[in-house]
């Protein structure tokens, strides 16, 4: 068709700070492509100010206006382009496919072992560097020893083919040593052995906590565990409507809701999981904190969604996950305080980007140390969840035993995750 791989993704960088950069994707279509693209955009810390999607079922055209959040965030636009190209179906010769297209097999899992002295913000500083290097945290195990030392085990995958050489692994460890400074005792990075490949879960979650965390009626303020009443009331005003009168071949899905981080990714993720095909979509700019989306959709058979039960199920699922894309609660584990964060896993098995980054940033801002942490998977009847456990360390400036302190922690963590 006279196109080269450079034309698949075009990025027109903004010349002024705060103004959006324009990202254009022009490639063959595939099911769930929009979700895959928005996932990468979210992974890079970018906020979509507006967007357009269109496809004829064979060819797809996407244009996104994006800005870094925060504005000070440095973006490697060339790396973003390569990552976006990698998830696009290719019409190119095999030579280019091997270089620029993602492989269908699972990427290798690496184990990063960090042994260091404990200090506030340690896990966030490691996580921040891993994000900058485009290394994705799949699982995490953090332990504090009685003598004040920390053993961090990060199970990571490599998005940029950095770790397949000994030099790349050593260079990554050197970067970490610089970031951690004198508190770093040792750092090792190697391929995770086969004994780690199947370890997705952890100790079971108590039934009473699981019911609260994964319930469809999840409450933002139940038992005083979350203090975001005003935010929740705004989100509950979300409107999700399906109109079958405007188009003879498509259902029009109209969404109006409170703006938040990852909103468009969440909507496209749910659409992908439910087998919804988007023929045309427009994401309007946020006005007074409210977003409007118009999506012309069909079911996986290429038909309008006319069945009332299917309409109700789709609208309910969208409203539920726009209201609670991430679940955040704080509980007591014996004498200790534990923060739990959960989010649905994509049907492809991928978790949500940057959750560890945002949670550890919020805790670092509150001057709270993490005594131990782990990431695992939990299955309920209708979906799989990624669950993050953080056992928090008591400090004199922020006593964790008070109800108000716990509410403040949940409020700060959730606001950071939602971009408020």
Give the ranges of each region predicted by the language model:
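Regulatory modules associated with amino-acid/nitrogen control
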Residues: 1-420
């Amino acid at each position: 068709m006279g196109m080269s791989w450079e034309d698949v993704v075009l990025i027109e960088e903004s010349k002024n700070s705060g103004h959006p950069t324009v990202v254009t994707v022009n490639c063959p279509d595939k099911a769930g492509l929009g979700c895959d693209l928005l996932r990468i955009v979210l992974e890079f810390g970018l906020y979509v100010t507006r967007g357009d999607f269109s496809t004829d079922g064979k060819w797809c055209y996407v244009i996104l206006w994006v800005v870094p959040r925060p504005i000070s965030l440095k973006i490697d636009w060339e790396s973003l382009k390569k990552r976006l190209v990698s998830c696009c179906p290719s019409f190119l010769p095999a030579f280019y496919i091997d270089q620029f297209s993602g492989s269908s097999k699972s990427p290798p899992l690496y184990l990063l072992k960090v042994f260091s002295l404990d200090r506030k913000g340690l896990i966030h500083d490691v996580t921040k560097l891993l994000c900058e290097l485009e290394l994705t945290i799949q699982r995490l195990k953090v332990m504090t020893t009685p003598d004040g030392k920390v053993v961090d085990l990060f199970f990571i995958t490599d998005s940029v083919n950095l770790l397949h050489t000994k030099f790349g692994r050593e260079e990554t460890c050197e970067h970490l040593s610089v970031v951690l400074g004198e508190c770093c005792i040792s750092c090792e990075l190697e391929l995770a052995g086969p004994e780690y490949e199947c370890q997705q879960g952890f100790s079971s979650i108590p039934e009473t906590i699981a019911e609260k965390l994964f319930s469809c009626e999840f409450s933002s303020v139940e038992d005083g565990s979350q203090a975001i009443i005003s935010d929740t009331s705004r989100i509950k005003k979300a409107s999700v409507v399906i109109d079958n009168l405007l188009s003879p071949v498509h259902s029009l899905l109209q969404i109006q809701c409170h703006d938040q981080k990852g909103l468009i990714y969440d909507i496209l993720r749910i659409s992908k999981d439910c087998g919804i095909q988007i023929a045309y979509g427009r994401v309007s700019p946020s006005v007074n904190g409210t977003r409007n989306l118009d999506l012309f959709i069909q079911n996986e058979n290429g038909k309008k969604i006319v069945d009332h039960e299917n309409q109700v199920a789709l609208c309910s699922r969208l409203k539920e996950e726009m209201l609670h894309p991430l679940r955040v609660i704080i509980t007591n584990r014996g004498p200790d305080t534990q923060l739990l964060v959960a989010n649905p896993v994509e049907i492809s098995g991928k978790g949500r980007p940057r959750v560890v980054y945002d949670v550890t940033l919020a805790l670092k801002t509150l001057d709270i140390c993490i005594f131990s942490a782990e990431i695992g998977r939990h299955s309920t009847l209708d979906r799989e969840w990624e669950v993050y456990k953080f056992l928090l360390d008591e400090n004199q400036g922020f006593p964790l035993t008070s109800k108000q302190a716990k509410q403040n922690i949940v409020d700060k963590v959730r606001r950071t995750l939602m971009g408020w």
